[in-house]
Amino acid sequence: MSLFKRLFTALRTGSVSSDEWDQIRSTLIASDLGVKLVDEVIEKVKSAKPDDAVLAITTHVKSWLSNKSRELFLDSDRLNTILIVGVNGTGKTTSTAKLANRLTKSDSKVLLAAADTFRAAATEQLQTWAGRIPVEIVTGEINSDPASVAFSAATKAKTENFNYLLIDTAGRLHTKQDLMDELGKVVRVITKQSPVDEILLVIDATTGQNGINQAKIFIEAVGVTGFIITKLDLSLIHISEPTRPY
């Protein structure tokens, strides 16, 4: 019998021991739900009537998640610029390609920008995706200024009447201020040609608690408007709670 089934069975009989509560707490924390939120869940369950325990948990967990409905794919009659950001290895390039593929299904004219000019084969990876979708792509020389690539792409997208510009950026540690400043420069340069409509932070959900620190710092640096969560697990709830309403 699963942990929660045992819990709900025990609640209905009014017989949850102190050791069982400790086990439940440890299991939830190990699932990366976060200490604060785990304690809130347990308190809600303890204070609920036995028959209301399931509803108490689901209602409380849902309250941590945003219920604000928002369409990511904006006004297709104008240029929409979407910047993809995040630390190394989270899946930014693949996520960029998936977004591009989704947009082309609605007959939108999409341009990709390979602004990750530092990672080996990053440009080639995005070029491969661009060829498969297919969509056009703007690239730069290896180790060239990412802001320059972004600006060239923004110029092309604006003058050639693209509906969407998706910019894949280099992975950067959120603890490196110089790299975060460089990302801010990319945003400033793009806005000379067109407003940045969305800044999407890609987070590998298996990073656990560190995902919160990543989210907070990227929000402060460039004003994140949304998240792409890869390798999804309970971390989504934990990250979502302190970063609402993003």
Report residues per predicted region.
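Active-site/ligand-binding-proximal alpha/beta "capping" segment
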Residues: 186-188, 211-228
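Primarily NTPase-proximal linker/entry elements flanking Walker-type ATP/GTP-binding cores
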Residues: 3-115, 121-143, 147-158, 162-167
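Conserved ATPase-coupling elements of RecA-like P-loop NTPase cores
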Residues: 122-124, 174-180, 211-212
